[in-house]
From Swiss-Prot:
It comes from the Eukaryota. Keywords: Amidation, Antimicrobial, Antiviral protein, Secreted, Signal. This is Peptide Ctri10036. Transmembrane segments: none annotated. It is found in: Secreted. GO terms for cellular component: extracellular region. Residues 1-22 form the signal peptide.
């Protein structure tokens, strides 16, 4: 009697493990693509941030130059 339950348990266990492996094999590629897209977005934000900082520095230098030129109106 116990051997019959053990056999049923093993069959159900194999089916469950097979289903889990199928689920994981379908889940892993989508998880990898999601992580890579997040990494790319992070890089893009960092690049845009550095471009924005450069633009702010350029505007500040431009304003400093205008301020300097306003002190010497002849030039």
């Amino acid at each position: 009697m116990n051997s019959k339950y053990l056999f049923v348990f093993l069959i159900l266990n194999v089916i469950f493990i097979d289903l889990c492996q199928g689920f994981l094999w379908s889940l892993i590629p989508s998880a990898i693509s999601a992580v890579t897209s997040l990494i790319k977005k992070g890089r893009r934000r960092r690049e845009l941030g550095s471009q924005y900082d450069y633009l702010q520095d350029f505007r500040k230098r431009e304003l400093d130059l205008d301020d300097l030129l306003s002190k010497f109106p002849d030039y």
